[in-house]
A protein has these predicted regions:
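Catalytic adenosine-cofactor/nucleotide-binding cores of aminoacyl-tRNA synthetases and other
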Residues: 48, 232-388, 393-394, 449-485
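N-terminal Rossmann-like or analogous alpha/beta NTP/dinucleotide-binding catalytic cores
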Residues: 2-124, 222-234
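Glycine- and acidic
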Residues: 7-13, 41-45, 207-212, 260, ...
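Long, amphipathic alpha-helical coiled-coil segments characteristic
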Residues: 391-421, 426
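Generic alpha-helical structural context detector
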Residues: 61-64, 97, 120, 230, ...
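Residue-level signal for inorganic ion chemistry
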Residues: 18, 28, 59, 99, ...
Length: 485
């Protein structure tokens, strides 16, 4: 019987959550949940120089906001803790010593100066930088003497000199590498701390990880990982390597280069569920045409074999389209709650926000698009008379003056200032003048906003602004428009 599925998301707390990392978290979560398994959060903080204060909280908050809840982790514990790598430091050296005794690793006493000279020579010869095996077969007496004398050392993995090492990956299939191409990587550094690669393998084994999901940049390291598993006699996990997330055909998306993090996207007004939905499709293809999936639906349809081998190019337009679908599906009160902070950036006068939001929601793709649309509420914008010229509505600057002059007494007499009542009164006036509605209402929208495109038509804007402001703006515009000759 197969072991219960156990997956882990193991980020380093080095800043904001990159979208590629969040995609890895999603795929790792889906693999566990689809199989009824356990999803583990492990914090890999051994690179102390790159740690950013507060970054661990960002990891927690991001996963919670997107619904990727974990079963074991630093904050909730579990049977194989601690779940912070720096708190596990004492255990790694003994595993490396075990490999030394088995002849699968060795002490390396090379100084930094020797290694620098070696790499300079290799560079001059046009060779790839690699360790030359200088300490690989030292006599035991020499090793014992150096250890007794306190000579600094690292412990290196002893890669077989001949043969090939292969592994199977769910996405990339069977991969084989000549052992001669693999470097004797360092397992334990001179300060006694493990390297990332070594700690990763030991922790994954001790935590019972059955499926390792990570970026394809780790494909080249995987043969070394496998040799470590074999050296210990441990079961090798199932590997699922994901293609890189690219900014374009040449450049990887990278938070070091200032590319959007999850936090950046949310600050701009992308919804967490929409971002997650987009990341599902960033390098993974569902069956059929459906593209909008709830998290429960994602769990149900998940199949890692449908991950693409090709790099996934981040498509902002696709993300906007998915976000727009999520915004349209929100309950009205939820949209109002999310939109209010963005409305606050542009509007500082009293308006009917519920009506505004009812007009914004069907048109809104990203919440940060809202403020630039609303700059006319606080102050009357300068209006070019030519804005009133519209072939479809058959309007001109001169006809606009006639239309607004006809509308002014109608609106002054209006006691019910609801949108529908205002529209009905304007419609009746248009019929009485034997004009189409647009002939009257297009100039009204321009007069109230100074813009050709607004969140709602003229009667919507009038209802949002209120009667007093509507009449004031029409009066102001009438004073500036020339009459028809």
């Amino acid at each position: 019987m197969a072991n219960p599925v156990r997956t882990r998301f193991a980020p380093s707390p080095t800043g904001y959550m990159h979208v590629g990392n969040l995609r890895t978290a999603l795929y790792t979560y889906l693999q566990a949940r689809h199989k009824g398994g356990t999803f583990i959060l492990r914090i890999e903080d051994t690179d102390q120089g790159r740690l950013v204060e507060g970054a661990t909280d960002i990891i927690y908050n991001t996963l919670r906001a997107t619904g990727l809840t974990w079963d074991e982790g630093p904050d909730i514990g579990g049977p194989v803790g601690p779940y912070v790598q720096s708190q596990r430091m004492g255990m790694f050296k003994q595993y490396a010593e075990q490999l030394v005794k088995a002849g699968k690793a060795y002490y390396c006493f090379c100084t930094e100066e020797r290694l620098n000279d070696l790499h300079e020579q290799q560079k001059a010869n046009g060779e790839m930088s690699h360790y030359d095996g200088h300490c690989r077969d030292l006599p035991q007496e020499e090793i014992s003497a150096k250890l007794a004398a306190g000579v600094p050392y690292v412990i290196r993995q002893k890669i077989p000199a001949e043969g090939v090492t292969g592994f199977d990956d769910v996405v990339y299939g069977h991969i084989e590498v000549n052992n001669s191409e693999l470097d004797d990587q360092i397992l334990i550094k001179t300060d006694g701390m493990p390297t990332y690669n070594f700690a990763n393998v030991v922790d994954d084994h001790l935590m019972g990880i059955t499926h390792v999901i990570r970026g394809s940049e780790y494909l080249s390291s995987t043969p070394k990982y496998n040799l470590l598993y074999q050296a210990f006699g441990w079961e090798v996990p199932t590997y699922i390597h994901c293609p890189p997330v690219m900014k374009d055909a040449q450049h990887k998306l990278s938070k070091r280069n200032g590319d959007a993090s999850y936090q950046d996207l949310v600050a701009k007004g992308y919804l967490p569920a929409a971002v997650l939905n987009y990341l599902l499709l960033l390098g993974w293809a569902p069956e059929g045409e459906q593209e909008i999936f709830s998290l429960d639906e994602m769990i149900k349809i998940w199949d890692p074999a449908r991950i693409s081998k090709s790099p996934a190019i981040f498509d902002p337009l696709k993300l906007r389209a998915i976000n727009a679908a999520y915004i349209r599906a929100l309950p009205a009160e939820e949209f109002r709650k999310l939109a209010d902070p963005f409305i606050d950036q542009a509007v500082h006068v009293q308006i009917d926000r519920d009506l505004l939001c009812a007009n914004l929601q069907p048109r809104c793709e990203v919440l940060e698009d809202i403020p630039p649309q609303l700059d006319f509420f606080d102050a009357v914008l300068p209006i070019d008379a030519e804005m009133y010229r519209n072939k479809k509505q058959k309007t001109t600057p001169e006809s606009a003056k006639e239309a607004l002059s006809a509308l002014l007494p109608v609106l002054e007499a209006q006691t019910d200032w609801s949108r529908d009542a205002i529209f009905e009164a304007c419609k009746q006036k248009a019929e009485a003048m034997e004009k189409k509605n647009g002939w009257l209402l297009f100039p009204l929208g321009i007069a109230l906003s100074g813009k050709a495109r607004t969140p709602g038509g003229g009667t919507d804007l009038a209802a949002m602004m209120g009667k007093e402001e509507t009449l004031r703006r029409i009066d102001h515009i009438l004073a500036t428009l020339k009459p028809a000759e």
